[in-house]
Amino acid sequence: MGDSSSSTSWSSKKDTEDDRMIAFMLSEEYSKLDGAVGRRLSNLAPVPHVPRINCYIPNLNDATLDHQRLLQRLNVYGLCELKVSGDGNCQFRALSDQLYRSPEYHKQVRREVVKQLKECRSMYESYVPMKYKRYYKKMGKFGEWGDHITLQAAADRFAAKICLLTSFRDTCFIEIIPQYQAPKGVLWLSFWSEVHYNSLYDIQAAPVQHKPKRKHWLF
């Protein structure tokens, strides 16, 4: 029993180390692409981020208008989205694509974010209007929508500044900064109407798009 437990623990530790090594290598390789997106948006004044749970889901008409607004902004700034599946995991898929250049590591990203929530409770608990343990357990489930608290936890866990190009009428650009360390990289996401995230690229450096499943998409 002891050997089995020790083996499982070693395997889990190795997986985590491998994930972080891959992320580091890819962040070095793609730093020029991230810089290209940053130059496109350099004239935008970011709005400070406020961690919060999801509390508003737009109706179809509002979502349609927001989607059109986001498409216009992408066009104006010469950016494009790598679209990820709308299966409830989109925030984690988009973060995975920015970290690993593949949305398929979303389970690992979610797991790291939930670890951050559990291990650093005092940093996030005041933003959660429910039993905190219930909140982070819920966030650990496949298909549970990420929110603005998980974005902050991701920024803290991966030591990355997360930049959102949004569809909001009054807020075009939001920055999420790690709370207690200098960011080592930048992750770029598009954020549509509180319901969907995609991974963001300079249009001239966009990777080949593999068509995702369209489950639960409005568009």
From Swiss-Prot:
Reactions catalysed, semicolon-separated, are: Thiol-dependent hydrolysis of ester, thioester, amide, peptide and isopeptide bonds formed by the C-terminal Gly of ubiquitin (a 76-residue protein attached to proteins as an intracellular targeting signal)
Provide the OTU domain boundaries: 79-203
Name of the molecule in the record: OVARIAN TUMOR DOMAIN-containing deubiquitinating enzyme 12
Q: Per UniProt, which keywords does this protein have?
A: Hydrolase, Ubl conjugation pathway
Active site, per annotation: D87, C90 (nucleophile), H196
Q: Does the keyword Hydrolase apply?
A: yes
Q: Which SUPFAM superfamilies match?
A: Cysteine proteinases (SSF54001)
MF terms in GO: cysteine-type deubiquitinase activity
Q: Gene for this protein?
A: OTU12
Q: Please explain the role this protein plays, according to its UniProt record.
A: Hydrolase that can remove conjugated ubiquitin from proteins in vitro and may therefore play an important regulatory role at the level of protein turnover by preventing degradation. Inactive cysteine protease.
Q: Which InterPro entries match?
A: OTU_dom, Papain-like_cys_pep_sf, Peptidase_C85-like
UniProt EC number: 3.4.19.12
Tell me which positions the record assigns to the signal sequence.
none
Q: Which family does it belong to?
A: Belongs to the peptidase C85 family.
| Stored Gene3D superfamilies | 3.90.70.80
Q: Does the keyword Iron-sulfur apply?
A: no
PANTHER family attached here?
A: OTU DOMAIN CONTAINING PROTEIN, OVARIAN TUMOR DOMAIN-CONTAINING DEUBIQUITINATING ENZYME 12
